[in-house]
Amino acid sequence: MGIFSFFSKEKKETLDKGLSKTKENVFTKITRAIAGKSKVDDAVLDNLEEVLITSDVGVETTLKIIDRIEKRVERDKYVTTSELTGILRDEIANLLTENKTEDGDGFTLPEDKKTYVIMVVGVNGVGKTTTIGKLAYQFKKAGKKVYLGAADTFRAAAVEQLVIWSERVGVPIVKQKMGSDPASVAFDALSSAKANDADVVIIDTAGRLHNKINLMNELTKIKNVMKKVIPDAPHEILLVLDGSTGQNAFEQAKQFTAATEVNALAVTKLDGTAKGGVVIGISDQFKIPVKYIGLGEGIEDLQVFRKREFVNSLFGE
């Protein structure tokens, strides 16, 4: 089933608006890079390389893109600057890791996994709890039975914020007192969700990056305890990154992917930044699909990531 069946005009407008600063930033620079040139030559490619690096795409991914364009120019002998954006768009789309759910009808869950367990990781301040709340809203809207687990027990604000979201969305939450063992909360949340035949349970975790070994041990313990309730849990480890932090998001991705088996990304706060290029670099470098993007503060402003729509929006189509 094609993606256009599910990508409404309203969603496209939200995406275009959310990426407008990034688009303006990248396009202005590309226009400047090819000014006065009719064909793609070394000077244009050097300028384009600088554009991509300064647009937070990342050095490794940028060099990969430039190399592919160079090969295309070599093969076709003559490539005009007017063709460059089309080639660039295709190469970026090819580099983005496939999100298997992007062809589906919005926020879907695998039919063969019930109760589906999502463990959410990320540093404090990236919009982790808000992303969980918006995910819960979308799953409930899709007719799913949702449970939340407040396993970030080190920050009172994290638990309080998740309680507010559970009340706002109208889904049950499992929590314990401040300072409780996070693994114990996860165990209780999965037990309750399973006993009540929930479709999905979303577990919040602490966002502390003070020590990689501690982080790894903490997340491993939570995962091991989950498996006692649901043997193949967690099915999804979703890393939430703040798109507006640019290269800092790369560092966070590096630390969390070293600490645990992240298999999905949510990139938030893309609406207020010109650094949306970070989505391309992170997906390529870590070979992890971007599953969701945050494009605003509204409850509907979390979207399923569709790479072709993202790239088209980035290039003003």
Predicted features and spans:
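Short acidic/polar alpha-helix capping motifs at helix-coil junctions
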Residues: 11-16, 125, 153, 215-219, ...
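Short hydrophobic/aromatic residue motifs in ordered secondary structure
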Residues: 59-61, 155, 271, 299
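Non-catalytic, surface-exposed connector residues within folded enzymatic/regulatory domains
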Residues: 42, 63, 78, 82, ...
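Short beta-alpha junctions and helix-cap segments that line functional grooves
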Residues: 3, 104-106, 135, 251-252, ...
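Conserved catalytic-core segment of NTP-binding enzymes
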Residues: 161, 181-196, 211-316
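Short glycine-rich anion-binding loops that position phosphate/pyrophosphate groups of nucleotides
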Residues: 206-208
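Primarily NTPase-proximal linker/entry elements flanking Walker-type ATP/GTP-binding cores
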Residues: 16, 20-151, 158-178, 186-194, ...
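Switch/coupling subdomain of P-loop NTPase systems
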Residues: 2-4, 9-15, 20
